[in-house]
């Protein structure tokens, strides 16, 4: 008896905290300051949703370390698997198709994911976001 193939199964298992290289916002004509292009993208969607969904919620990363003091910008230390020091811009979350996730880079440790979760919640609340360095 042959094994039935579940149409929802993916060829690889995507987990919350995984960082992949892939395209982000390629189809849109975006303004300055909005992340787009081929870059590190961090999966922030829950593992339960990742098992069945054909798309995932992600946070774009950048190697341009500008506005590092913002509460929604999380700068990572040098992590094996990422080519450069990376900052994730949690206020710019988006959705990508799992087929667009190209190269697996690494999985972030729980302490960094707590910071990412907090920054995403700050961005979602729409509260006035202050700079950690200047307080403005």
Placement of each model-derived feature along the sequence:
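Compact nucleic-acid interaction/catalytic patches
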Residues: 30-78
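Short acidic/polar alpha-helix capping motifs at helix-coil junctions
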Residues: 5-9, 38-41
């Amino acid at each position: 008896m042959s094994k039935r193939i579940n149409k929802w199964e993916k060829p690889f298992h995507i987990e919350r905290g995984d960082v992949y290289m892939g395209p982000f916002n390629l189809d849109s004509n975006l303004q300055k300051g909005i992340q787009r292009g081929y870059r590190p993208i961090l999966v922030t969607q829950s593992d339960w949703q990742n098992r069945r969904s054909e798309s995932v919620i992600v946070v774009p990363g950048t190697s341009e370390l500008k506005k590092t003091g913002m509460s929604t910008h999380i700068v990572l230390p040098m992590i094996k698997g990422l080519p450069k020091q990376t900052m994730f811009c949690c206020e710019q979350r988006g959705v990508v198709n799992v087929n667009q996730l190209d190269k697996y880079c690494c999985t972030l440790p729980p302490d960094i994911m707590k910071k990412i979760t907090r920054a995403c919640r700050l961005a979602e609340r729409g509260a006035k976001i202050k700079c950690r360095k200047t307080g403005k």
